[in-house]
Design a protein with these regions (language model features):
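Extended, histidine- and acidic-residue-enriched regions that form the cofactor-binding/catalytic faces
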Residues: 10-134, 140-348
Length: 348
């Protein structure tokens, strides 16, 4: 029969050195008593939910997980800086290797929307049962239904009195709707006349291109194949005409953010129809770790104040493109079809 152990002073987290603060602690691999003791101090748990997904020939199938974990480390470090003298341990929950609407290609695994909703909610409720008081749901997968599924987990945690958020929601909105000028330093090394059009089109660089490859070079460099330097640019994308018409209609009624989201989706649909299908957007050849650091610093500057606000009681940001759930009949409509035989073989 199990029994309860009264918490002692030794149960509280006391780092042996400054380096200990950044050492990841896989909370679900600790003895149960120790895991609960660590959570009693209110330290946030980072839960990564990312697909196994094709990212072209130059990135790994778990690239989203690797970037999520790297960002979790940077977010945690910034949170500790904000809590001078009161560091939190870096608590990681086991990753859910699952995602809705992954880019199709060799090795990709698709999970249905409703199935992922169930997986996320059960994982979050289990963390609440364990004693988590704060949870950060991390992902680097921007599919709208994926973000909505993560929000189901956020809502389940909030209902249990746990403060929680998915910070990528804010970053996705930034990329889709905000001017790209804050990212200009990431393109300082790109010669003109390429630089200006690259910056203007950055919001449409949504998969395994210059931006994501730079993130990976900054956060998980050993996972990036140098072939990215010689890959041909993604061919020009013809956005879906019907979605562009909807975007113009949204603009006319004053829904500028919805219009911007519809344009991103229109480019995504057009990208999926490229034949052969490259598996990446934009120009991975220009990606560098230095550019990745620009993107990482921006992510930290936007996400960490938000995390602190939510931990203090503010509401978390909603998922972008929440209308996608209704548009797809709750995820029942099939996603984009990219047969394996049309995926470009760009590896030598």
């Amino acid at each position: 029969m199990g029994g309860q152990c009264a918490p002692t002073a030794g149960d509280r987290y006391t780092p042996r050195s400054e380096a200990d603060v950044s050492d990841p602690i896989p909370i679900l691999e600790l003895p149960h008593r120790q895991a609960r003791a660590l959570l009693r101090g209110g330290a946030p748990v980072f839960l990564s939910i990312d697909p196994v997904e094709y990212h072209g020939p130059h990135l790994s199938l778990r690239n989203d997980h690797l970037v999520s974990t790297g960002l979790s480390r940077r977010f945690h470090a910034a949170l500790c800086e904000a809590r001078v003298g009161q560091p939190w341990p870096f608590l990681l929950a086991s990753t859910l290797d699952a995602g809705v609407d992954p880019t199709q290609g060799p090795g990709s695994r698709a999970v249905a929307f409703r199935e992922l909703c169930g997986l996320v909610v059960r994982a979050c409720e289990a963390l609440a049962d364990l004693g988590a008081e704060r949870v950060v749901l991390m992902t680097f997968h921007g599919a709208p239904l994926h973000s909505i599924a993560l929000q189901r987990g956020v809502d389940a945690l909030l209902a249990r009195g746990v403060r929680a958020l998915a910070p990528l929601n804010l970053l996705l909105v930034d990329v889709a709707t905000s001017p790209p000028e804050p990212f200009a330093p990431a393109l300082a090394h790109v010669p003109e006349p390429e630089r200006a059009p690259m910056l203007a089109a950055l919001r449409h660089d949504f998969h395994a291109g210059f931006m994501e490859t730079s993130f990976a070079l900054a956060l998980a460099p050993s996972s990036v194949d140098p072939i990215h330097r010689t890959l041909p640019d993604c061919p020009p994308i013809t956005p879906d005409a019907r979605l562009l018409r909807l975007a113009r209609a949204a603009d006319r009624v004053g829904k500028a953010d919805v219009a911007a989201e519809l344009r991103v989706v229109a480019h995504g649909v057009g990208w999926s129809k490229l034949r052969p299908f490259p598996g990446y957007t934009a120009q991975p050849r220009h990606a560098t770790a230095e550019a990745g650091e620009v993107f990482v610093r921006y992510a930290v500057s936007r996400a960490v104040p938000l995390i602190l606000d939510v931990f203090a009681g503010a509401p978390p940001p909603p998922p972008p493109m929440a209308w996608m759930e209704q548009l797809t009949l709750g995820g029942r409509m099939p996603g984009l079809d990219i047969p394996l035989e049309v995926v470009a073989d760009l590896a030598p």
